[in-house]
Amino acid sequence: MQFIEGGVTAAKGFLAGGIHCGIRKNKSKADLAMIFSKTPCAAAGVYTQNLVKGAPILVTRKNIADGRAQAVICNSGNANTCNADGEKKAWRMCEIAGEALGIDPHDVIVASTGVIGQILPIAPIENAAPALAALLNENGSNMAAKAIMTTDTIEKECAVKITLGDKEVRIGGISKGSGMIHPNMATMLCFVTTDCAISVPMLQKAIKAAADTTFNMISVDGDTSTNDTLAIMANGEAENEEITEENEAYKTFLEALTAVCRKLSMMMAGDGEGATKLLICKTTGAKDWETAKTVAKSVICSSLLKAAMFGEDANWGRVLCAIGYAGADIDINKVDVSFKSAYGQVDVCVNGAGINFSEEEAAKVLHEKEITILVELNSGDAEADAFGCDLTYDYVKINGDYRT
């Protein structure tokens, strides 16, 4: 497997682009994106577990219930959620994309991100869609990534290539997410494309498995958005032997898909609203993956721990506290905790009790931009990683002014 450039247009047959249509007031901010496959695709997705779901999710689920899609249309600046006419407008967006691209509107994945509860203006999308469709190209992934951003500070895209048999297969993705990120499938949107030939059931299985160990392991602020969507389209243009079962080809594909999702997840976590540090909680020595996952997520979700990391304070008690209320079946007297970064590693807790360590050295470890919290449970061989960021003053400022 090799990481490559190209995002959602790295795979054969995919075009993408973004444009400012007028939903957002700032004309320098693109707010409408499209991704298009020249040929029909197998499609699959996973969505928010929030009981309040954005209208685009309701429409997309219906559209890809048959496992087929050919395009994505997504706006930023308005979530199209909790609106009386939301579903009607989400469907209208599918029609607009279908008309502009010459495809069936039922083959369109629709998504929106932005403020909840505001009426979505449809005219700007209608007016801009033909121009956007004309701009789509094989180098348009970055513009599409920009167009789906809200409070993000960087565009997020990633791609890899692998070999299946004698064929080169590519997988690429773009994502957005900076706040309201605590998925259980960040607002989290991710669109993945691949030229792999793979059946719909196996594609759905793969995207669910990849999400479980990547996107579902992120927490920026503990809020699960109404619009979280992870969708994948596979057009088969790599011409590999179609993957229809859990064979070696499927395992290779899943590993590559997970790598793309992991990279995007880490970019999202590190770009959390107001964040200055990417946090990774690596839990090892668990009796099973479920236990490792539960502990890792509990630690990464702790607001007290996030604040301590911002302050570069090696307050390991907050780690043990989060482990204690995680609800996992563990022996706290076996737990070891360390903090690690590019500077080095400092051990702070052994067998559930504090040990002597240099606070000065610990502060230097925590001064780096990427911090790993190592939690060793000493009860088995399972492990899991969770991703998050520190909690800063700017998080409050950003969300206090979000609608202004």
State the predicted function of each range:
Residues 1-88, 92, 98-404:
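A structural signal for small-residue-enriched, beta-sheet-centric alpha/beta enzyme cores
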